[in-house]
Every structure is written in C-alpha cells, then in structure tokens.
Amino acid sequence: MAESVIEKCTEQVSNRFKLALLASQRTHDLNTGASNPVQSARFKGHKNTIISLYEIAERQVDTHELFSLLVSRCKEYMKGNLSNTYSSNTSKLEKLLNFSNDQFNTDADVDQESTDIQDDEVENEMSNQDSEDIDDEVDNEE
C-alpha cells in the first residue's frame, strides 16, 4: 500500500529527495495546524506523514506552493541561526571589553607574579567561554 503511494508520488515529483522535502513541508503544515487535510474524513486515524504523501500523490496540494513554503521556512531558519550567532559573539565581546577598573590593578608596585596570576585567570576565563561556545554549537546542531 505504501509502495503504491510512493510510486504515485514519483509520478508527480520526479526526484525522490524533493518528494521527501515536499512531504516534510506538508506534514509540518498539518502538524502546526497551518492547514487541514483536504479530505479529513477519509484520512481519519492516519498519521500526518501518510496524509501528506496521499495528498501529493492525488494532486490535492500544489507542489509549487509547498516548495515555496519550504524555501521560505528554510530562509527564516537560517536568518534565526545567523542572528543568534552574531548576537552571541557580540555579547561575549561585550563581556570581555566591559571589565570594571577594579578588576585591573594599576599600581606601579605590582610585582610580576601577581600579573602572571591575573593573566592566567583571564586565559582560563576565555578558554572556559570557548568550551561553552563549542558545547552550545554542538547542542544547536543536535
């Protein structure tokens, strides 16, 4: 049964990868409530993925419209990721640049040992922030 639906779908959409993307977009629309199944009584009890494939196979949805919705959704996603990347880098830069004057000892009597300790503390803080950034990027990719 599912194989015949896929065969019908490939008659409508020649590329199987594009078919998967279009079915994904249609399923997303159904899951979010953006639209209802065209024949809701017929598909009662079916999962939205199967409903999407049936609708594509039977030409009940416009594949060109689905593709344009998919492209716009991808663009929004990329804009969100890019703005998050830039905003997080900006906030890290602000943290590094906004040290208060009390954090730096400007006395001329400071010996080299205390300066080395402060340098080590700053390097540790920067490496901790870098490791947190890597962890955040890994979490976002998952």
Curated annotation (Swiss-Prot):
Keyword Nucleotidyltransferase on entry: yes
InterPro entries in the record: DNA-dir_RNA_pol_omega, Pol_omega/Rpo6/RPB6, RPB6/omega-like_sf
Keyword Nucleotidyltransferase part of the UniProt annotation: yes
Gene Ontology molecular function terms on file: DNA binding; DNA-directed RNA polymerase activity
Bias type Acidic residues, positions: 108-142
Region (Disordered): 104-142
Gene3D superfamilies: 3.90.940.10
Keywords: DNA-directed RNA polymerase, Nucleotidyltransferase, Transcription, Transferase
EC number: 2.7.7.6
GO cellular component: DNA-directed RNA polymerase complex
Cysteine pairs bridged by disulfides in the record: none
GO biological process: DNA-templated transcription
Residues of the signal peptide: none
Catalyzed reaction equations: RNA(n) + a ribonucleoside 5'-triphosphate = RNA(n+1) + diphosphate
Similarity comment: Belongs to the RNA polymerase subunit omega family.
Functional description taken from the UniProt entry: Promotes RNA polymerase assembly. Latches the N- and C-terminal regions of the beta' subunit thereby facilitating its interaction with the beta and alpha subunits.
Subunit structure, as described in the record: The RNAP catalytic core consists of 2 alpha, 1 beta, 1 beta' and 1 omega subunit. When a sigma factor is associated with the core the holoenzyme is formed, which can initiate transcription.
Name assigned to this protein: DNA-directed RNA polymerase subunit omega
Organism listed in the record: Wolbachia sp. subsp. Brugia malayi (strain TRS)
Lineage: Bacteria, Pseudomonadati, Pseudomonadota, Alphaproteobacteria, Rickettsiales
Gene symbol of the encoding locus: rpoZ
